């Protein structure tokens, strides 16, 4: 692995003393060698070589840099080229093996000037200077070396060109095409026989061009990705360099693109986001930088099924490089690509087919060209949002009622809206301003009192100014709309008849088709002045039009959007004939929008706040992103799925350092979002299934602790609900499916880290249900998992205070079951403790709301029993496992809402315990495991919502515990592994954004740990494994949001630690690894977003490691100047196969040379 970067020794200015340096590793980043690749001329204090742009071919590195001797101004402001030169240095990599040890070296040739290849005149202009695009350049499929470059002319105008060599660098030429003026720092890739050149534009949206031949002019890619990304929320700030690379993932060729949101403005450029596109659909993977850190220049590398990002961070003009492993982001990408492939595979050319996976969506898809963009589908339940089938952009709905095969809009303002420019900064349907085809099937149920809108494109947010549309009037006539051109009503319509509508616009000409026939008067100019329109949104009905003179009654069966020219007559006819297939049952279960970011478990206990099992996407601590998909540490977006402790988002799909399960968007710990799937620990949502401890909900199935409801399954201790399904610990929702502790969402399916269960939804104190949805953070189980306060269910996984099943462990109000552990929100244990919000446990007894019991197993409001397991609301028993809301018992396991017990295992919402395992939002417990809303217990394992315990394993948001295992939302514990967002830890290894590790307990959002492995924003813990927002723990291994590691350590965003290996965003430390955004630590290795440290090993968003230190978001180590905008290259077996780079500003306020690089573990 090789890194190339600017080394700025004295200041962060680009006009200072700068060298180009290289650092390389042959042992997966364990050790590094450093070289100066290209020295500046040393003729003045501002001599410099800048903006390295790198090509890798075979085992050679071609590095192009600009050279300046004494000038002190920015290069594009130079009036002539006297102080400028352009240099090419070639490095040759050799590797050898001796005695089983691999060694490598890079031999750099002397830089050669290429100034002689730069013509004095170009396309009628007098030229001045040129530089590389500052990033990765490419080797074309024909073997040519291709550099995208930025050129200035004598008028100081900047534009982009292609600079290429056909003979491995001996001679060079400029291609004929060029960009518009103002386009700088270009990056390029090869795509389907063309070059795609992506350029920075200050104060405006990015321009992307296509070039099919070096001898032909460039063409702006207006129908795909040009003008999609803005430099800031209002597109009125400077732009930024970007990474733009083509890779093959899951068998699909796609492009990865990074770009900061720049909320702060100017050249600060904060919140670096990662995007995915196949040159048709565009998906926001999420934010890859942390919080609001300034992270302009970046580079992405995908190699050996691993994804990495190198980016700079700027803190008060002190620059550092950060290298991050994007584990969760890669899982999200794979999930999205599976969705795309499933939809595409289900829709062969001209073969329309209705999609209805898992009863959640109904859409007819007719791909008429490779450039098909499916706009949205209708959800089964009453929606506030209609999600795009390709998971890119959602639509908003108002006054919508779910009907067979579609949505019925009724009442004033009833309709749907799909944003175009309303998406804000990043507009994924920007192509529609040039050409589009909009298709829908509609049925009108009654005549309006005046003309009412039916379908179209609007130029303003109010919907008053339309570009193209169709209305229907009280005389049963159609009223087409062609811009401001007056049109006479034509044709006729019938009540109750379904019509197939097609609206097309290309070359500023609009047409309307009804049932395959061109409507009279079509073919009108919709933009008379010739300007390019700026479409605000597409609409169906009178979406939120309060000025509507009539109440609309329209049913929409399907809506599709094509990003292409007007369809021809044959294609229109094909669309019309396919409508008869609408209503056919579907075949594409895998493409459904099921729960997200969790992975299914088989014959096991599924619960909330469980850690991911296999390829899962977990998310957390994301910040808002605006008009975009927001994800981990992202910022708000508009109509979108939000996740992981994120703030509300509007149109976007958000996730956070998580890993999706099956082509699905899921979230957890998220705050309210609109058109989104909301889950775990969220507050009420609309059209959602709400659960556990929820307040009343309407049209839903209410469960878990609920009081009676009408035609509904209501359960344990909840407040009444009407036709709704509510489940454990959630707040009220309206016609929606929400789950435990979830925040409000609108028309979405909320699940909370759970995966689907088998047609049954059982809940606390509820009666058995069939074909239903199971909730509260549970994952599916096969031979059934039953939980507290429920009645029995059969081969199904029931969650959150649900009733017992057979063969299972029955709890609260249930009948006993054998060897199975069922509980709501429990974490995994072996043969023991079941707790709330955890993962499954085996041969253990969990219960809920039970009172104390004596050597017996009693359940649900039962009186004391002997040698048995007691559960919910039962009377006291001794040596028994009691749980959930139980009163104190002795030598027993108590859980969920239980009162204090002694030698007992209590979980979920329990009070503090000592020598026990406490978890999730619990209060402290003593040598006892207490669970679910229980009071303190002694010698036991306490979990879910419990407070601190000592010598235990504590996790997610837990409070401290003593000799116990604490999990989920618990506070500090001792001898424990603390993770994510924790503060200082001592003798431990810290990790970041990683998922479970072995042998160690890793979790997320935990607080500090001591003699333990502390990671990601975690605080110290003592001899306990604490995770997820937990407080300090000691000797343990902690991780968060990462992938599993074995006796290894990964960390991020943690604060200072002592003899510990911490990483990610930490400040400098000495022989140790310190973590993310942390303060200094002693004898530790500091890495990731940290200032330089010595012998350190850092990794990012950690992937599995073995007895090694892995860290995340690590910055350069070793006393040196800092570097940025670098290039990373993978050089396996002497062959440089991939590149990874950035370019531009980098500083470490240190006059020392060389050691200016980040550390990384591969």
UniProtKB/Swiss-Prot annotation:
Renumbered residue ranges of the record's region Disordered:
587-1123
Q: In which family does this protein belong, per the annotation? A: Belongs to the glycosyl hydrolase 33 family.
Q: Which CDD domains match?
A: Sialidase_non-viral
Q: Which gene encodes it?
A: TCNA
Indicate what this protein is called per its UniProt record: Sialidase
Additional notes on this entry: The variable lengths of the long tandem repeat domain could account in part for the polymorphism of the TCNA protein.
Q: Which reaction does it catalyse?
A: Hydrolysis of alpha-(2->3)-, alpha-(2->6)-, alpha-(2->8)- glycosidic linkages of terminal sialic acid residues in oligosaccharides, glycoproteins, glycolipids, colominic acid and synthetic substrates
What keywords are annotated for this sequence in UniProt? Cell membrane, Glycoprotein, Glycosidase, GPI-anchor, Hydrolase, Lipoprotein, Membrane, Phosphoprotein, Repeat
Repeat (BNR) residue spans along the chain: 23-34, 163-174, 209-220
Location in the cell reads: Cell membrane
Is Repeat one of the keywords?
yes
Q: Which GO terms describe its biological process?
A: ganglioside catabolic process; oligosaccharide catabolic process
Which ranges are annotated Low complexity under compositional bias? 589-615
A single GO cellular-component term on record: side of membrane
User: Which GO molecular-function terms appear in the entry?
Assistant: exo-alpha-sialidase activity
InterPro entries (alphabetical): ConA-like_dom_sf (IPR013320), Sialidase (IPR011040), Sialidase_fam (IPR026856), Sialidase_sf (IPR036278), Sialidase_trypan (IPR008377), TS_C (IPR055239)
Q: What's this chain's function?
A: Developmentally regulated neuraminidase implicated in parasite invasion of cells.
Give EC number(s), comma-separated: 3.2.1.18
Instruction: List every stretch annotated 44 X 12 AA tandem repeats, LTR domain.
Output: 589-1120
- Annotated Polar residues bias: 616-689, 699-1123
Gene3D superfamilies recorded:
2.120.10.10, 2.60.120.200
- Glycan attachment points: 342, 394, 1125
């Amino acid at each position: 692995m090789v890194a190339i970067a600017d080394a700025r020794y004295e200041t962060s200015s680009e006009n200072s003393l700068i060298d180009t340096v290289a650092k390389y590793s042959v042992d997966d980043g364990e050790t590094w060698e450093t070289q100066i690749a290209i020295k500046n001329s040393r003729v003045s204090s501002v001599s410099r070589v800048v903006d390295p742009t790198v090509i890798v071919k075979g085992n050679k590195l071609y590095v192009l840099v600009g050279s300046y001797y004494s000038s002190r101004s920015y290069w594009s402001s130079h009036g002539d080229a006297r102080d400028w030169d352009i240099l090419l240095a070639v490095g040759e990599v050799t590797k050898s093996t001796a005695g089983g040890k691999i060694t490598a070296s890079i031999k750099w040739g002397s830089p050669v000037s290429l100034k002689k290849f730069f013509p004095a005149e170009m396309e009628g202009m007098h030229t001045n200077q040129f530089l590389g695009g500052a990033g990765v350049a490419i080797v074309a499929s024909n073997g040519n070396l291709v550099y995208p470059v930025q050129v200035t002319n004598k008028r100081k105008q900047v534009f982009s060109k292609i600079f290429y060599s056909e003979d491995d660098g001996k001679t060079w030429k400029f291609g004929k095409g060029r960009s518009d003026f103002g386009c700088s720092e270009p990056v390029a890739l090869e795509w389907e026989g063309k070059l795609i050149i992506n350029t920075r534009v200050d104060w405006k949206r990015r321009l992307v061009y296509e070039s099919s031949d070096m001898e032909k002019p460039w063409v702006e890619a207006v129908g795909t990705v040009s003008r999609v990304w803005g430099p800031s929320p209002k597109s009125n700030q400077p732009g930024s360099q970007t990474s733009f690379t083509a890779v093959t993932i899951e068998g699909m060729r796609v492009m990865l693109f990074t770009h900061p949101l720049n909320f702060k403005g100017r050249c600060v450029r904060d919140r670096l986001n990662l995007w995915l596109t196949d040159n048709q659909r565009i998906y926001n993977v999420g934010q890859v930088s942390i919080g609001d850190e300034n992270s302009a220049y970046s580079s992405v590398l995908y190699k050996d099924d691993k994804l990495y990002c190198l980016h700079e961070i700027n803190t008060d003009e002190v620059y550092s490089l950060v290298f991050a492993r994007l584990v969760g982001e890669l899982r999200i990408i794979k999930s999205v690509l599976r969705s795309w492939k499933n939809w595409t595979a289900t829709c062969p050319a001209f073969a329309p087919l209705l999609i209805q996976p898992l009863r959640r969506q109904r859409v007819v898809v007719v791909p008429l060209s490779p450039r098909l963009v499916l706009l949205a589908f209708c959800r089964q339940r009453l929606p506030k949002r209609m999600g795009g089938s390709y998971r890119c952009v959602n639509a908003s709905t108002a006054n919508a009622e779910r009907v067979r095969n579609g949505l019925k809009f009724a009442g004033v303002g009833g309709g749907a809206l799909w944003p175009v420019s309303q998406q804000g900064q990043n507009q994924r349907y920007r192509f529609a301003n040039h050409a589009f085809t909009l298709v829908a099937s509609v049925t009108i149920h009654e005549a309006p009192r005046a003309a009412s809108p039916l379908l179209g494109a609007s130029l303003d947010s109010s919907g008053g100014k339309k570009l193209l549309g169709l209305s229907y009037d009280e005389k049963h006539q159609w009223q087409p709309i062609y811009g401001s051109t007056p049109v006479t009503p034509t044709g006729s319509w019938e009540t109750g008849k379904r019509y197939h509508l097609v609206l097309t616009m290309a070359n500023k000409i609009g047409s309307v088709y009804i049932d395959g026939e061109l409507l009279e008067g079509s073919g009108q100019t919709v933009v008379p002045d010739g300007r390019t329109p700026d479409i605000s949104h597409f609409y169906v009905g009178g979406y939120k039009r309060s000025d509507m003179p009539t109440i609309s009654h329209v049913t929409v069966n399907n809506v599709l959007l094509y990003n292409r020219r007007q369809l021809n007559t044959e294609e229109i006819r094909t669309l019309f004939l396919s409508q008869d297939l609408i209503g056919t049952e579907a075949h594409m279960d895998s493409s459904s929008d099921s729960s997200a970011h969790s992975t299914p478990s088989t014959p096991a206990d599924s619960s909330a706040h469980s850690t991911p099992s296999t390829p899962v996407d977990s998310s957390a601590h994301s910040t808002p992103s605006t008009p975009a998909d927001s994800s981990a540490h992202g910022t708000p977006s508009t109509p979108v799925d939000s996740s992981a402790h994120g703030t509300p988002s509007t149109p976007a799909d958000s996730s956070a350092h998580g890993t999706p399960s099956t082509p699905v968007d899921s979230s957890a710990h998220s705050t309210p979002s609109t058109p989104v799937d909301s889950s775990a620990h969220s507050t009420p949502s609309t059209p959602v299934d709400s659960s556990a401890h929820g307040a009343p909900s309407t049209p839903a199935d209410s469960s878990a602790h609920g009081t009676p409801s009408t035609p509904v399954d209501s359960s344990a201790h909840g407040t009444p609900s009407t036709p709704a399904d509510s489940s454990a610990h959630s707040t009220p929702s309206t016609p929606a499916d929400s789950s435990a502790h979830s925040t409000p969402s609108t028309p979405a399916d909320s699940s909370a880290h759970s995966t689907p269960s088998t047609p049954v939804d059982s809940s606390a104190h509820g009666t058995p249900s069939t074909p239903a949805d199971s909730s509260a953070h549970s994952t599916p189980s096969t031979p059934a998992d039953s939980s507290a306060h429920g009645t029995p269910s059969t081969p199904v996984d029931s969650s959150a205070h649900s009733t017992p099943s057979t063969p299972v462990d029955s709890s609260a109000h249930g009948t006993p079951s054998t060897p199975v552990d069922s509980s709501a929100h429990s974490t995994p244990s072996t043969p023991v403790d079941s707790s709330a919000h955890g993962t499954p446990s085996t041969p253990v007894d969990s219960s809920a709301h039970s009172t104390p019991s004596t050597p017996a197993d009693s359940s649900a409001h039962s009186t004391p029993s002997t040698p048995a397991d007691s559960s919910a609301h039962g009377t006291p028993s001794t040596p028994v496992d009691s749980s959930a809301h139980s009163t104190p018992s002795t030598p027993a396991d108590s859980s969920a809402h239980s009162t204090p017990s002694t030698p007992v295992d209590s979980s979920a919402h329990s009070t503090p315990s000592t020598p026990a395992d406490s978890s999730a939002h619990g209060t402290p417990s003593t040598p006892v495991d207490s669970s679910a809303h229980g009071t303190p217990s002694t010698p036991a394992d306490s979990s879910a919502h419990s407070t601190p315990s000592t010598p235990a394993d504590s996790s997610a948001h837990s409070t401290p515990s003593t000799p116990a295992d604490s999990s989920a939302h618990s506070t500090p514990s001792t001898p424990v592994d603390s993770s994510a967002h924790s503060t200082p830890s001592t003798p431990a290894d810290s990790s970041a954004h990683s998922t479970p590790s072995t042998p160690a307990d890793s979790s997320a959002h935990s607080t500090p740990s001591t003699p333990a492995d502390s990671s990601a924003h975690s605080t110290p813990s003592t001899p306990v494994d604490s995770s997820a927002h937990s407080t300090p723990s000691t000797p343990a291994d902690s991780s968060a949001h990462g992938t599993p590691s074995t006796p290894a350590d990964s960390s991020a965003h943690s604060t200072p630690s002592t003899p510990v290996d911490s990483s990610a965003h930490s400040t400098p430390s000495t022989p140790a690894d310190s973590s993310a955004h942390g303060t200094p630590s002693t004898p530790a290795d500091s890495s990731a977003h940290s200032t330089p440290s010595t012998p350190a090993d850092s990794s990012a968003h950690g992937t599995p490691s073995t007895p090694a230190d892995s860290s995340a978001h690590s910055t350069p180590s070793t006393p040196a100047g800092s570097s940025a905008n670098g290039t990373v290259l993978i050089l396996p077996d002497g062959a440089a196969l991939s590149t990874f780079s950035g370019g531009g500003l980098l500083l470490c306020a240190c006059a020392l040379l060389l050691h200016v690089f980040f550390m990384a573990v591969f």
